[in-house]
Amino acid sequence: MPRRGPVAKRDVLPDPIYNSKLVTRLINKIMIDGKKSKAQKILYTAFDIIRERTGKDPMEVFEQALKNVMPVLEVRARRVGGANYQVPVEVRPDRRVSLGLRWLVQYARLRNEKTMEERLANEIMDAANNTGAAVKKREDTHKMAEANKAFAHYRW
């Protein structure tokens, strides 16, 4: 931990088109090697694809997808008397959003569509419909927490 106390959190600016901080955070997650304009192009094209295919506002679809992907519980390793226990803990709200965005981008990258725009659009639409790899990741995380419920009293 730093000697000068905790580092102040930087506030992200809302993006120019959708005026949303969530969209900016998603752009930052998509970005590789500091190429932000490329990441913006990917996301905005993906949103156009979503608008085209669903006929709905892409922001609504994205927010629904994020809601379906954000985990409520996760497990953390805790060492007790020489044994490592997977202790279920509640996920902080800011970490929930971060994990949700990270999983959306991570599993979009693993898809088989030709362009990243299509992959991201399809992963967001799947997540909004409660299907897709990112939602499965959340379910697996919750299952792990449920399976290790017995160690919940080791919470810190």
From Swiss-Prot:
Mind telling me which PROSITE patterns this protein's record contains?
A: RIBOSOMAL_S7
Q: Does the keyword Transmembrane apply?
A: no
| CDD domains per record | uS7_Bacteria
Q: Which GO terms describe its cellular component?
A: small ribosomal subunit
The source's superkingdom equals: Bacteria
Under the heading InterPro entries, the entry gives: Ribosomal_uS7, Ribosomal_uS7_bac/org-type, Ribosomal_uS7_CS, Ribosomal_uS7_dom, Ribosomal_uS7_dom_sf
Q: GO terms for biological process? A: translation
The molecular function GO annotations come to: rRNA binding; structural constituent of ribosome; tRNA binding
UniProt signal peptide: none
Which keywords does UniProt give here?
Ribonucleoprotein, Ribosomal protein, RNA-binding, rRNA-binding, tRNA-binding
- State how it assembles: Part of the 30S ribosomal subunit. Contacts proteins S9 and S11.
NCBIfam families per UniProt:
rpsG_bact
Q: What does this protein do?
A: One of the primary rRNA binding proteins, it binds directly to 16S rRNA where it nucleates assembly of the head domain of the 30S subunit. Is located at the subunit interface close to the decoding center, probably blocks exit of the E-site tRNA.
Stated family: Belongs to the universal ribosomal protein uS7 family.
Q: What is this protein called?
A: Small ribosomal subunit protein uS7
Instruction: Please tell me the species this chain comes from.
Output: Geobacillus stearothermophilus
